[in-house]
């Protein structure tokens, strides 16, 4: 009896019609994919993208050269050298570099920073034309921080209840 039923199902193409019905149902529904460069998905305030160093409102850089971000980095992408300041003798960074080819964007550096100096912005569309550009130095990181400070502050404010 089952052999006869299987023969009738295959003769009437029941499985094919069931598959066509399912395909037709999804064919008429709204598209899930986006055309990436033209359409972009919204990003979370916790998105981890390009790194930046922040400044205080008076223009002084926040980094106190504690080297916690360098110590906690699992990819060993951060290099810091510290030295005393000329005016008040406090410790500040003389060299702050992040090798973006090594970075895995884990966010540990951001979490470990006691003064919220190193942050990751929402910017993920950046490129490098030469291999030497992969190392972001202190000047470039500070420039990123100045450029995205409004967005960084808004993201920090939105995320504050969860910290």
Curated annotation (Swiss-Prot):
InterPro entries: 4Fe4S_Fe-S-bd, 4Fe4S_Fe_S_CS, NADH_quinone_OxRdtase_chainI
Cofactors: [4Fe-4S] cluster
Catalytic activity line of the entry: a quinone + NADH + 5 H(+)(in) = a quinol + NAD(+) + 4 H(+)(out)
Listed SUPFAM superfamilies: 4Fe-4S ferredoxins
Function text: NDH-1 shuttles electrons from NADH, via FMN and iron-sulfur (Fe-S) centers, to quinones in the respiratory chain. The immediate electron acceptor for the enzyme in this species is believed to be ubiquinone. Couples the redox reaction to proton translocation (for every two electrons transferred, four hydrogen ions are translocated across the cytoplasmic membrane), and thus conserves the redox energy in a proton gradient.
Quaternary organization: NDH-1 is composed of 14 different subunits. Subunits NuoA, H, J, K, L, M, N constitute the membrane sector of the complex.
Protein's UniProt name: NADH-quinone oxidoreductase subunit I
Higher taxonomy: Bacteria, Pseudomonadati, Pseudomonadota, Gammaproteobacteria, Chromatiales
